[in-house]
């Protein structure tokens, strides 16, 4: 067994010392290509590979690197929220409606209704109850339920206490309470 076959040295496998010196001094194509070459078996294949590698180097240096593709996906959260808030202004104002004793919630659009009377009729048909007529003195007369709403400040008020436009802008959610629970919210309830 030869000593050269079992010798441990630093360098690329399968390359002789002469080839390694060529690589270090820059006379080899391998340095320009940044890829390891397999050892060639014949002179003819070596010359063919050098020609193709030289052509490849010329082509790659003259061509511009490929442009990065634009990443397509969700927009940043801030833009998404801005757009959704803008669309909400154009669309409806949806609020949740709950009723004491009912195991479900509903959601309604306040912009669909033109005033309190239309809203109350819709709530009566939605929950199959009678709310009665609202008066500032007596509240909701003739009903065991009183419609209330939570405003921007978190206060619960009777539906009908403020003008309709102010109600639409300040209402966060609606709740149809029992009349006994709504006693402290308005006059004569």
From Swiss-Prot:
Cited Pfam families: AUX_IAA
Domain PB1, residue spans: 92-179
Motif (EAR-like (transcriptional repression)): 8-12
Taxonomy, superkingdom: Eukaryota
GO CC, any one term: nucleus
Record keywords: Auxin signaling pathway, Nucleus, Phosphoprotein, Repressor, Transcription, Transcription regulation
Induction or repression: By auxin.
InterPro entries: AUX/IAA_dom (IPR033389), AUX_IAA (IPR003311), PB1-like (IPR053793)
Domain characteristics, as noted in the entry: The N-terminal half of the protein contains two conserved domains I and II. Domain I includes a slightly degenerated ERF-associated amphiphilic repression (EAR) motif which seems to be involved in the activity of transcriptional repression. Domain II is required for the correct degradation of the protein through the SCF-mediated ubiquitin-proteasome pathway. Interactions between Aux/IAA proteins and auxin response factors (ARFs) occur through their C-terminal dimerization domains III and IV.
Function: Aux/IAA proteins are short-lived transcriptional factors that function as repressors of early auxin response genes at low auxin concentrations. Repression is thought to result from the interaction with auxin response factors (ARFs), proteins that bind to the auxin-responsive promoter element (AuxRE). Formation of heterodimers with ARF proteins may alter their ability to modulate early auxin response genes expression.
Entry similarity comment: Belongs to the Aux/IAA family.
Name of the protein described by the UniProt record: Auxin-induced protein IAA4
Organism annotation: Pisum sativum
UniProt lineage: Eukaryota, Viridiplantae, Streptophyta, Embryophyta, Tracheophyta
